[in-house]
Regions:
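N-terminal nucleotide-binding beta1-loop-alpha1 segment
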Residues: 1-17
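Short aromatic/basic micro-patch
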Residues: 15, 103, 140
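Short, well-formed alpha-helical segments that are part of the catalytic scaffolds
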Residues: 16-39
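Conserved N-terminal catalytic core of the sugar/cofactor nucleotidyltransferase
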Residues: 31-92
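Acidic metal-phosphate-binding loop of nucleotide-sugar-dependent transferases
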Residues: 75-76, 101-103
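Short aromatic-hydrophobic micro-motifs that form the base-stacking/packing surface
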Residues: 93-97
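Conserved donor-nucleotide/metal-binding helix-loop-beta segment in metal-dependent transferases, i.e.
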Residues: 105-131
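Active-site oxyanion/phosphate-handling segment shared across diverse enzymes
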Residues: 141-164
Length: 164
């Protein structure tokens, strides 16, 4: 079973604008650290899904210069951005990670993939009951589950988040 990854990222943030391109050390950005961590994971394709806003053009340029695949979509309807990205790349099973979490643990990623592959679930996460620190959350779901959520989400709160 192939598990692909969509990483949601944006430059706009009320608490810390531009945090995904924050220079953490020697020119290495937050998003770069995240991709370094994911290199040793069992994830197949990794796509960064960013808004179409002009403020995100700098992130788009950085990703292109770093040879990182990128998808641009709705700024406010993050569920639609994810759904359209999954369709564009024909993903069947998707891990969701946020781009401002450079300390994601590839062992946790691989353990989640293994658990998802060996279960008969449509959704798996390590964050329903908090046992992991903030910034290490992962979610895996089927493209079918994502499509159902996309079709039936009506409230603004259901569209601005990919999962509850």
């Amino acid at each position: 079973m192939e598990i692909d990854c969509i990483i949601q990222a944006r430059m706009g943030s009320e608490r810390l604008p531009g945090k995904v391109l924050l220079d953490l050390t020697n020119g290495k950005k937050t998003i770069d650290f995240l991709f370094e961590q994911l290199e040793s994971s069992e994830l197949k394709k990794k796509i960064v899904a960013i808004p179409e806003n002009s403020e995100d053009d700098i992130l788009f340029e950085h990703l292109n210069n770093s040879k990182i695949l990128c998808f641009r979509g709705s700024s406010l309807d993050v569920l639609d951005r994810f759904y359209c990205c999954s369709k564009e790349f024909s993903f069947k099973h998707i891990m969701r990670i946020t781009g401002d979490n450079p300390l994601i643990d590839p062992d946790v990623v691989n353990e989640a993939i293994n658990e998802y592959e060996n279960s008969n679930c449509d959704y798996l996460t390590n964050s329903i009951r908090r046992t992991f620190p903030n910034g290490t959350e992962v979610e895996i779901f089927s493209s079918n589950s994502l499509e159902v959520a996309w079709k039936f989400a009506r409230k603004k709160s259901e569209r601005e988040h990919v999962t509850p």
